[in-house]
């Protein structure tokens, strides 16, 4: 995790998988079902699609220090399928900044999946208290995508 000015954090997590890249891509871009397998994502609605540009409304919720914390974002995503890159940025939402990418790389024995996120909380949001949670969420999101791809691969 990289600590940037003004309460901004940049995080990255990666995993190697035997799952082929096309199947990981299929799972990542199954926008209307992400909330069925991504932990703490309570809603994911495809608002608009035009070519490789997608608008997605998402809501997440989780307990933090005994309190329920919820956040909503309207994301714009750009799909770069030949390169297996999915970039996203917040158009509107409960953060000052929320952007990043998912990247899939082909490997001889499968693939690697990289998730990068830059987030800046709203004024008054104790980013120091949630940064460990953010780090854990990145890893659990990667594992959830791989697990869903594995489930679909076996079907």
Where are these regions (language model features)?
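Short structured motifs
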Residues: 10-11, 41-45, 59, 85-87, ...
């Amino acid at each position: 995790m990289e600590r940037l000015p003004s309460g901004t954090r940049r995080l990255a997590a990666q995993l190697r998988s035997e799952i082929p890249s096309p199947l990981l891509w299929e799972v990542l871009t199954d926008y209307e079902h992400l909330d069925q397998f991504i932990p703490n994502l309570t809603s994911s609605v495809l608002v608009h699609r035009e070519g490789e540009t997608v608008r997605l409304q998402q809501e997440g919720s989780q307990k933090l220090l005994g309190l329920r914390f919820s956040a909503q974002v309207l994301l714009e995503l750009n799909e770069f399928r030949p390169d297996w890159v999915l970039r996203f940025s917040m158009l509107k939402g409960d953060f000052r900044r929320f952007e990043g990418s998912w990247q899939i790389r082909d490997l001889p024995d499968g693939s690697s999946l990289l998730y990068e996120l830059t987030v800046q909380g709203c004024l008054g949001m104790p980013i120091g208290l949630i940064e460990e949670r953010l780090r854990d969420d990145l890893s659990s999101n990667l594992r959830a995508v791989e697990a869903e791809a594995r489930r679909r691969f076996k079907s």
